[in-house]
Amino acid sequence: MAIQIPSRQLFIDGEWREPVLKKRIPIINPATEQIIGDIPAATAEDVEIAVEAARKALARNKGRDWALAPGAVRAKYLRAIAAKIAERKSEIAKLEAIDCGKPLDEAAWDIDDVSGCFEYYADLAEGLDAQQKTPISLPMEQFKSHVLKEPIGVVGLITPWNYPLLMATWKVAPALAAGCAAILKPSELASVTCLELADVCREVGLPPGVLNILTGLGHEAGAPLASHPHVDKIAFTGSTMTGSKIMTAAAQLVKPVSLELGGKSPIVVFDDVDIDKAAEWTAFGIFWTNGQICSATSRLIIHENIAAKFLDRLVQWCKNIKIADPLEEGCRLGPVVSGGQYEKILKFIATAKSEGARVLSGGARPEHLKKGFFIEPTIITDVTTSMQIWREEVFGPVLCVKTFSSEDEALELANDSHYGLGAAVISKDLERCERVSKALQAGIVWINCSQPCFCQAPWGGNKRSGFGRELGKWGLDNYLTVKQVTEYVSDDPWGWYKSPSKL
């Protein structure tokens, strides 16, 4: 039976609301290229209504309903959301798979992580209560001082299409835990599950206006959200180019932003590895989520002593990856998200060949799949560091390869990038791994693995991969401001000026 896409409206002030201009955007299943539904298209007019709803939510009952409520109150809602997501896991995972092309097993894993992330931030919300009025030791006895942690206000959350609900959760859960009111704008290429999050919030009775969800195009909904004077912060995950535009818009209002942007992450494989273990992690690091991961380890830097043997084995692993409709049992590589992304990736591969690189494996549509935006797992060798394929993010199932002869050369190649999100090193020599992990210019380093992610650990990059950290306690701090409160406690007058009474 075909999976039905629920027909939803925008979610504003706790209610479903038709877009002011009544526009909608078709949903295309990337595995079949068929239209399977549509989503509402918000514009600046809807952003205005959502911002007003969010500001009212913060001010309601002088803030006591949400922003100034005990963290334990907000935690109850977060736990209710987590439970409802877990209850609807199977249904939501299927919607995710047909909307963005992610293999169903991966989508189900994502939904588990969504539920776990809401639970985690429920715990941190409760912990906030104990952190209020933290005393500060001062050098002058006449004063005492403490710190308050307060929500930053109304936040705009702009999220990508590769992990539609999970990436939204990485922002929504800590923002709500902190006591902010949020406006979520997911990517127009994959918004279905974010609208289901709205339905979950409605079911659990989340106070109106605390979370508003606007689907729509970036220039029609995302841009007016980023530049709105009554939005106190923007958190964005997406391309470096769009991140730069958001920074520019926010700069006009001196508005804080946190950005998780592109990557061209390296995986360094030394010559002492177990070939099969290292080959599987190398494949997982680039072909998981159909290669559409900001942190994908898309540059393989392999020791020359084992390069030929390793690549032969890696090709065998790639040929064993089941490429299929995401709902098909055992699927491990689905289609990329859209026709535009499909064409862009094929152009990257063509340019690599024209610049002198060699496609060792893959590089085209799988022969057995005539429809859908499918691309084989692709390995490209004979790469130079000046080539586009080495320098630019592909965001697809494409791995480029270079060899090295020394640790210093490996590090030079690994750090030869404008990006600095993730990096991996694989070796049995753990002292070497520790040394290399310190030298890698990245916000996340994996040792003897690639891509594991836990909501307890910080996530974010350096260089053009952005700044700020999501997840863990760092993710909560993204949505909090710190207020110093200092009191004069001496009975004596301050005594700096001569008292008029003594003149």
UniProtKB/Swiss-Prot annotation:
Top class in the EC scheme: oxidoreductase
EC number in record: 1.2.1.-, 1.2.1.19
Amino acids binding NAD(+): 238-245, 294, 393
SUPFAM superfamilies: ALDH-like (SSF53720)
pH relationship of activity: Optimum pH is 9.75 with 4-aminobutanal as substrate.
Residues the UniProt record annotates as site (Transition state stabilizer): 162
Pfam families cross-referenced by the UniProt entry: Aldedh
Major location (coarse): other
Active site residues of this protein: 260, 294
Signal peptide: none
Tissue distribution of the protein: Expressed in leaves, flowers and fruits.
Family assignment from sequence similarity: Belongs to the aldehyde dehydrogenase family.
Designated name of the protein: Aminoaldehyde dehydrogenase 2, peroxisomal
